[in-house]
A protein has these predicted regions:
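Intrinsically disordered, low-complexity N-terminal regions enriched in serine/proline/glycine
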Residues: 1, 11-12, 59, 83
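Conserved beta-strand hairpin/beta-sheet module of binuclear metal-dependent hydrolase folds
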Residues: 2-52
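Intrinsically disordered, low-complexity boundary segments flanking structured domains
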Residues: 1-3, 113-114
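Active-site HxH/HxHxD metal-binding segment of metal-dependent hydrolases
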Residues: 43, 47-136
């Protein structure tokens, strides 16, 4: 199901349960928009990158729901890419227990601490216009 689809120019998307965007920055470097729901999604993205000879330089998270940041930790560990998110989304990406805590109103019980509500933490930086590639 993890299929790379060309849109136009240097823009692609990865067909998956939680679609991901991919932008070629040059012949070898790419950035990813969201990273899927877990390390398995990250592994499949890494396979697509390797098959195309691409190096992941950054992940831009649109928001901090677990199905959009779940592959961050795996991909960052494998590629040393930077991860960016805006505002409070950056904080939730760094501290994913906040996602189910907001739902519950306090530290979430075990039933709310699973990969569908709480991704693994990743080292995200604040997304500002200055960190975006030219043309974004």
């Amino acid at each position: 199901m993890y299929e790379l689809n060309h849109i136009i120019g240097n823009s692609y998307y990865i067909q998956s349960p939680s679609k991901m965007g991919l932008v070629k920055l040059n012949d070898t470097d790419v950035c990813l928009i969201d990273s899927g729901n877990d390390k398995d999604a990250g592994r499949k993205v890494r396979q697509l990158l390797d098959a195309n000879g691409w190096h992941l330089t950054a992940i831009y998270n649109t928001h901090s729901n677990a199905d959009h940041i779940g592959g961050n930790r795996y991909l960052q560990g494998q590629t040393k890419c930077k991860i960016y998110a805006q505002g409070i989304e950056c904080d939730i990406t760094r501290h994913p227990v906040l996602e189910p805590a907001f739902l519950y109103g306090g530290f979430p019980p075990k039933d709310l601490r699973h990969k569908f509500l709480m991704a693994q933490e990743s080292d995200a930086k604040e997304l500002t216009p200055g960190v975006l590639p030219e043309g974004f």
